[in-house]
């Protein structure tokens, strides 16, 4: 969510309208994943002094939605997944108004996109270095052209990102369901966060902010990762910069492809 905070505090749309949801599911910030040992907060040093942020989880807190079923059935498709996925917002889209807490959040976001006729939607994520789809954009088929143009422009700036099509048969994900259920061009972006990985060493604030981990350096040498991972690690500032640069590239690509619907956002950090 740090890229979203950067947008809220800096971005100035001069043409078009920009909606930013910094915490898609506020419940996820009220707890951390059990048995993972992740810190509740992390601190970022800024020119104005230290700023403290919650770390949280990707899942709705059990205090808001419990118990998990043995099997989670996606409401609109009937797809069956592990019961714990019932609290994963990115398996709940397009949601339903009378569903679980997580489904209601998904429904609210879907309804906002419909009501405001939002033309393009970007869901910002992080993933572990060993996850196959990382440092990448996942695009609904209607958004593939915009994503392709954006990635080519990023390459000119020496920023390499992959491009993945949204799976048609994996349901509940934002890039699939929002693209199917609304008129928006649905995209999802992934950067890499070693604090989320299975191969990590000590889990603390330094790992979240500095992104350095000897275990991942070793895993890189063994060819077990899908992104480069050296002694410099994958710091938070680099991950946020990648998201912001990719968003700017998407804005520019959309504007060039849709001259009647300009999306020009100034004051974007670079």
Protein language model features and the residues they cover:
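Active-site/substrate-binding loop(s) of hydrolase catalytic cores
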Residues: 1-152
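C-terminal accessory segments enriched in acidic
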Residues: 101-108, 112-120, 124, 129-270
């Amino acid at each position: 969510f740090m890229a979203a905070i950067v947008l809220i505090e800096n971005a100035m749309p001069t043409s078009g309208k920009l909606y930013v949801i910094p915490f898609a599911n506020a419940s996820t910030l009220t707890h951390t994943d059990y048995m993972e040992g992740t810190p509740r907060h992390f601190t970022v040093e800024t020119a104005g002094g230290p700023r403290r942020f919650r770390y949280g989880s990707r899942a709705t807190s059990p205090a808001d939605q419990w118990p998990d079923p043995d099997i989670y059935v996606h409401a609109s498709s009937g797809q069956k997944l592990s019961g714990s996925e019932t609290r994963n917002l990115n398996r709940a889209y397009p949601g339903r108004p009378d569903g679980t807490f997580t489904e209601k959040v998904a429904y609210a976001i879907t309804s906002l996109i419909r009501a405001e006729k939002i033309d393009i939607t970007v869901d910002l994520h992080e993933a572990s270095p060993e996850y196959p789809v990382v440092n990448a954009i996942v695009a609904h088929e209607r958004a593939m052209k915009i994503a392709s143009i954006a990635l080519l422009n990023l390459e000119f700036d020496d920023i390499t990102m992959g491009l993945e099509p949204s799976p048609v048969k994996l349901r509940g994900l934002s890039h699939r369901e929002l693209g199917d259920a609304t008129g928006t061009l649905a995209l999802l972006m992934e950067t890499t966060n070693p604090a989320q990985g299975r191969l990590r060493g000590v889990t603390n604030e330094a790992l979240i902010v500095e992104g350095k981990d000897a275990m991942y350096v070793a895993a890189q040498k063994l060819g077990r990762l899908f992104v480069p991972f050296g002694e410099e690690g994958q710091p938070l500032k680099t991950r946020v910069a990648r998201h912001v640069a990719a968003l700017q590239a998407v804005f520019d690509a959309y504007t060039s492809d849709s001259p009647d619907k300009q999306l020009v956002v100034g004051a974007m950090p670079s």
